[in-house]
Amino acid sequence: MKKPLILSFLFSLTACTAVPPKNSDNICATFREKEDWYNDAKDSFEKWGVPIHVQMAIMHQESHFVADAQPPRTWLLGFIPWFRPSSAYGYAQAKDETWDDYLDSAGSWSADRDDFADATDFIGWYCNISHNRLGVSKSDAANLYLAYHEGHGGFHHKSFLKKPWLQQVAIKVAKRSTLFQHQLGTCEKELQSESWFFW
């Protein structure tokens, strides 16, 4: 009797684990598969003014929609697992100190980095600050990503100019944002009607 109980318990744990969308390159497919995600991203847009396609492009780059994503560990002497290079965690890859700032100013005490709704709200919050402090348009995915990656101080001092690789990543994020915008234009009415139906 013990073995079936253990297997049942393990299955229940697996079922509770957030699985990334099967087709993360198609925002319509992603929102159809993850039924609550469209409304979560829309809530963030209505709260912070950062377009859904921009939020999702940044999240795609940061975690590929993996709930518990973390930077890979470094290796000591080539074979001993060592520390991770940063405390970044979750869908938005928010670092500990930045997440704490978010909780203090905008989030709720129960917000989690591995919760999609909280993560997309965090991205909206951070990009809204980038807009207010740095004058970056909320539709400018490339520069919003540079500010997201480098921090507001780093972006202000143009630290990204010394990182050609990062500039290429920002261009990639901008292209994905444009792709997501076009894709969303073909399915958003459907998503809106479905969300109204299940409200």
Tell me what each language-model feature is.
Residues 4-13:
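Sec-dependent N-terminal signal peptides
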